[in-house]
Amino acid sequence: MGSVNPAVAGYPYRVHSAAVTTQLQFRDDAYLKSSRAQVHAISERGIVLDRTIFYPLGGGQLGDVGVLVRSNGERIAIADTRKGDTVESVVHIPAPGAPLLQPGEEVALEIDWERRYSLMRLHTALHLLSCVVVAPVTGGNIAPDRGRLDFDIDMSKLDAGRIEGETNALIASGVPTETVWITDAELDAQPDLVKTMSVQPPRGAGRVRLLKIPGIDLQPCGGTHVRNIAEIGAIRVVRIRNEGKRNKRVEIALAS
């Protein structure tokens, strides 16, 4: 079930509806900064809502932070967001000492947009990086200040200047991104779509979401992305280092 969050430890599991699922609003529109929702359940892990704009930790991308606002104006800080016990449930983890919400209660949702937008820009930039460095991806992580990919490649083939220049040239092309859905069976028939060896595509609902950058990239991804790669602005290569036989790490940051 996952670790117990100290902010809600000791409270009994309470549910407003038998079906504890969450409408993933961030999946349909990553640019939603605020929304409204109803509390579905309170568990030892945190708060489950009937819908959310908060992206949960996954695919190397950090979970969103922000606040839930009660009808009386009281603000509950959300310190992290994680996946729930089912494919389409999301747990909002309140900061320690936060007031406890009640099942059925209506709340307003506000994400830390500046942080999220940085994550979106960097996540899309990493997709471009995976096209510039043509090698199996063995790991990755996206934080607000920088992102990184690990590659199974010889260090001698990684030149920071070339990588930075080619990635920024792709960004400058200003290509719009697209969301494509395929079935699990269609993905199984096209294994080459999966570049990342350490992260499995988001399965479980019978279909898989792909990020398409026409003419550049197509791969499974459940994360949040910019509408046009020009929004990334530009990136800089922070460092390249050897993390092991099959892990050569390329770290990037936004240039502005």
Give the positions of each predicted feature.
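Active-/binding-site microenvironments in catalytic and ligand-binding cores
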Residues: 2-256
